[in-house]
Amino acid sequence: MKKKNTENVRIIALGGVGEIGKNLYVIEIDSDIFVVDAGLMHPENEMLGIDVVIPDISYLIERADRVKAIFLTHGHDENIGGVFYLLNKLSVPVYGTKLTLALLREKLKQYGHNRKTDLREIHSKSVITFESTKVSFFRTIHSIPDSVGVSFKTSLGSIVCTGDFKFDQTPALNQTCDIGEIAKIGNSGVLALLSDSANAERPGYTPSEAAVSGEISDALYNSQNRVIIAVFASNINRIQQVIHAAAQNGRKIAVAGKNLQSVLQLARKLGYIEADDELFISVQDVKKYPKREVAIITAGSQGEPLAALTRMANKAHKQLNIEEGDTVVIASTPIPGQELIYSKTVDLLARAGAQVIFAQKRVHVSGHGSQEELKLMINLLKPKYLIPVNGEYRMQKAHSKIAEETGMKRSDIFLIEKGDVVEFRGQNVKIGDKVPYGNILIDGLGVGDIGNIVLRDRRLLSQDGILIVVITLDKQKKHLVSGPEIITRGFVYVRESEGLIVQATELVRSIVTEATETSNVEWSTLKQAMRDALNQFLYEKTKRKPMIIPIIMEV
């Protein structure tokens, strides 16, 4: 079948710009819609009770019949964590490499996804043909194996999404970046490049993964006690380095965390991690071995490194606690928005008696290319237009300046925000009208049922507590039958504040008595009067503003 000429290309970021995480890019080629990555983001500190955040996907749901496929660049949560929610609304094939799809299957199983899914495995030489485009792939190097970039070939030129990448001359696990294929795509003509901006502010080159192995091995060699190493569960390269270093230093390995255990088992089964069975012991058996002969790898329930460490430092972990003399290696960088938690965790570990090795030593290197690598990608692909993605705005802006240094014109670089549309029609390009965008907050099984008002209420409850006022009125005569009864949680300790509670009770009684003297009292008006009076009274007495909930019952 002859491939028709492309008339219109639209590129939209529903996530992954102005932020780190929840990558979701929409490539529209004529009437066909393709999705590149569908990730999640870990909540910021003020998002109380929220488990994860995903992009608003209403734009895709409203055009479900036009969505042809989802393409995944690699298996990190920031890129596959939102696929479950997309597949609940869309019936489309999902393309990814062997490891990426294996991790996705585990995640779908974890979320209880029971709908039929069409997962199609690809490799770097795969080519998939649609009506108006051919989709091909190229190998990239990142902190997880089986990473690829995606190229959509159209008659206007190729649309290339790099995914997360760096150029590493001494990579872990013998991974290689297909520079030849990237150059080949560049020589065939690239219309637009969506390129990783996460390290655009960092000059030079990102250090090689090989630099980490020595530091981790030194930590295991120098410590006479247990060594606990915290990683992201999905950082398979780092896990392999820890296993190799532990074996070299004669240490048994215990793996703490179900998510981490699951990823490790999967990666070993598929051949991405090599380790002998006799290296591993259970967490329960750690105490049976001399401390000098044990290494513990840990990650949190969401795969993040800090949650489990915090519990260990607070003596709240079910199986392991930090002991005096332990060495803790944090082989990761803070999740954006959780830098304060990172700092507090390091402090907690130090208080618990641990020697903490983290950012000051090279126990972690980034999986993202720095400025010289971003220039190399631009020079290999020679795009007509550049769209910096996967970064906060300042990173996108730094990427733009780097591109100008390579000779690109500022007018050919688009610093887009979420919901922006870059539209190519023939030889013309413009920024089109915004599409719906935003965050969907996930709390347990609830998807999108938590908004700013709920988060505000949670903040109020966490700061000043709650005060509930209960009164009972005669249904006919409208006078007070019982109460007011005041119940507080997280506001004041009642036994030490009896005088305050008595005064508040009398204040409510006087408001109710005055209001019920009129025959046509409105409950909403009465509740608001109680709320206003108590707010003013309690703030004058305590300088606090608890959430006040009046309850009126009739008998």
From Swiss-Prot:
Its cofactor is Zn(2+). GO terms for molecular function: 5'-3' RNA exonuclease activity; RNA binding; RNA endonuclease activity; zinc ion binding. Disruption phenotype: Not essential. While depletion/deletion of RNase J1 or J2 has no large impact on global gene expression, a double mutant alters the expression of hundreds of genes. Keywords: Cytoplasm, Endonuclease, Exonuclease, Hydrolase, Metal-binding, Nuclease, RNA-binding, rRNA processing, Zinc. Substrate binds at residues 364-368. GO terms for biological process: mRNA processing; rRNA processing. GO terms for cellular component: cytoplasm. Binds 1 zinc ion per subunit. The inability to bind a second zinc ion may explain its very poor exonuclease activity. It is found in: Cytoplasm. Zn(2+) binds at residues 74, 76, 142, 164. Its EC number is 3.1.-.-. NCBIfam families: MG423. Present in about 3000 monomers per cell in mid-log phase. Endonucleolytically cleaves the 5'-leader sequence of certain mRNAs. Endonuclease digestion by the RNase J1/J2 complex occurs at a different site and in some cases more efficiently than J1 or J2 alone. The exonuclease activity of the J1/J2 complex is highly processive on substrates longer than 5 nucleotides, on shorter substrates is distributive. Plays a role in mRNA maturation and stability. Appears to have a limited effect on 16S rRNA maturation, despite its similarity to RNase J1. This subunit alone has very poor 5'-3' exonuclease activity. Belongs to the metallo-beta-lactamase superfamily. RNA-metabolizing metallo-beta-lactamase-like family. Bacterial RNase J subfamily. Unclear whether it forms homodimers or belongs to a larger complex. According to probably does not form homodimers, while shows homodimer formation. Both reports show RNase J1 and J2 interaction, probably as a heterotetramer shows it is a component of a possible RNA degradosome complex composed of rny, rnjA, rnjB, pnp, pfkA and eno, while finds no evidence of an RNA degradosome complex. This is Ribonuclease J2. It comes from Bacillus subtilis (strain 168). The lineage of its organism: Bacteria, Bacillati, Bacillota, Bacilli, Bacillales. The gene is rnjB.
